[in-house]
């Protein structure tokens, strides 16, 4: 008998086909009604789950009796109740590294677009406002040779820094819980406190993991430390920045602009951010290219197969469960 796998979000079609060939697959269908109820029904005898973006915790996993793995098609895992998975000896795996360069591309895209008012000017032009030469209201900020501050110099943060250093001759500052000489090497990156980074940087890109320490890391106090011409970009997780404090800072022109791919609550359906010309809002698409999402899905598939065939997968979020049996 084939093992049962729940697909809880849309994934690459080729990977979906492989799943259906090798497992008894149940794909949750929002069009068919309450997804929570579908999950409660099917998780009882599921051996594995694969997908991304859905909150999975003891409330919807409690009926599970055979579940061995949740294979997340993502790097972040803040939507999973890891402590509960540890209690139940359920593997949680993710897909790091394959999306590093793609996410860094988007981070630098947001930096450039916010600095040069790309979204605002696109709308301005399409609205027929280009009657004469542009004026100061349409002017942006230079990027070449400026100072780039990275909050969270992990793989993605370092990839953003490389783009700034090699492509735009930028001076690199970074703040981390600990110095990262192995990643800073070759970038002439200077380690400094968060306050100093905010005070000195022309551009600030946030790439930290979301945890108890980083939640609301950037609040009104930190925004007040930034330069009035500074641009803030967030490609990490929404709760790292106090969203209302950022809105107030943008309204008051306390900073020049912001570029956001993540938010405190997602999907973002209504927000004061939508009323502001000095912020670019994207729908959490840091890794969303055809090639990268395919690689992520393939890696997630392999993680799933490894566990269901009795092997330790390559990327385990909760190594405490290694060696447990179900």
Report each predicted region and the residues it spans.
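Rossmann-like adenosine-cofactor binding region
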Residues: 57-60, 178-272
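Phosphate-binding beta-alpha-beta segment of Rossmann-like dinucleotide-binding domains, i.e.
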Residues: 96-147, 159-163, 167, 317
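NAD(P)-binding Rossmann-fold cofactor-contacting core
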Residues: 166-184
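Rossmann-like dinucleotide-binding domain for NAD(H)/NADP(H)
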Residues: 92-93, 229-326
